[in-house]
């Protein structure tokens, strides 16, 4: 799920500031997003079929409200904004996991079984010496933002960057 507007602008601005001040730039390879399914390989010739199947699946799922607020970490390697939602987000992820296994023949990954929704701001290239300063910079953003999610975006890696290739609408409320 790739939010637009203010939240995307703030995340990008923080990523650019981290790059400028500490040369932390890996997170700039993708827009700020909340992952529902980890990256997977898929036959490019069947991409249109993939999109159609995902459109059909998501057209039955209701939009949801989530809140992006607060900063947390995974160890000393990943700094992210926390995502809070009711059970509808976990249900969507579980349903998508089942759909991907059944309809796309994709295997369950560890991250599919241990879902922890978040929005990464810095990861992989955060040096230990910069970690606390980077975390403090992100915490200063003091984000507390409700988000109405009415679409899910399909990202594809092109020329080393993740780009949205399709926005898939969810059912109207």
What are the residue ranges of the model-derived segments?
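Basic, often amphipathic N-terminal segments
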Residues: 1-65, 86-145, 162-173
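Structural motif
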Residues: 30, 74-75, 158
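Short hydrophobic/aromatic-rich beta-strand segments that constitute the beta-sheet cores
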Residues: 36, 80-81, 121, 154
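Extracellular/lumenal ectodomain signal focusing on beta-strand-rich modules
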Residues: 68-70, 151, 167
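Charge-rich, low-complexity N-terminal segments
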Residues: 75-78, 82, 87, 91
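Low-complexity, intrinsically disordered Gly/Pro/Thr-rich segments
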Residues: 138-140, 148-156
């Amino acid at each position: 799920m790739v939010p637009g507007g203010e939240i995307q602008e703030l995340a990008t601005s923080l990523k650019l500031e981290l790059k400028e001040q500490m040369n932390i730039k890996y997170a700039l390879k993708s827009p700020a997003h909340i992952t529902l399914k980890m990256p997977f390989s898929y036959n490019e010739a069947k991409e249109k079929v993939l999109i159609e199947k995902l459109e059909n699946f998501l057209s039955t799922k209701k939009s949801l409200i989530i809140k992006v607020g607060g900063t947390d970490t995974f160890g000393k390697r990943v700094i992210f904004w926390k995502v809070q939602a009711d059970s509808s987000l976990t249900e969507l992820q579980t349903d998508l996991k089942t759909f991907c296994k059944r309809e796309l023949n994709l295997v369950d990954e560890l991250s599919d079984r241990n879902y922890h929704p978040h929005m990464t701001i810095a990861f992989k290239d955060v040096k230990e010496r910069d970690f606390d300063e980077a975390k403090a910079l992100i915490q200063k953003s003091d984000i507390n933002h409700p988000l109405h999610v009415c679409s899910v975006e399909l990202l594809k890696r092109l020329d080393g960057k993740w780009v949205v290739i399709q926005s898939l609408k969810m059912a109207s409320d």
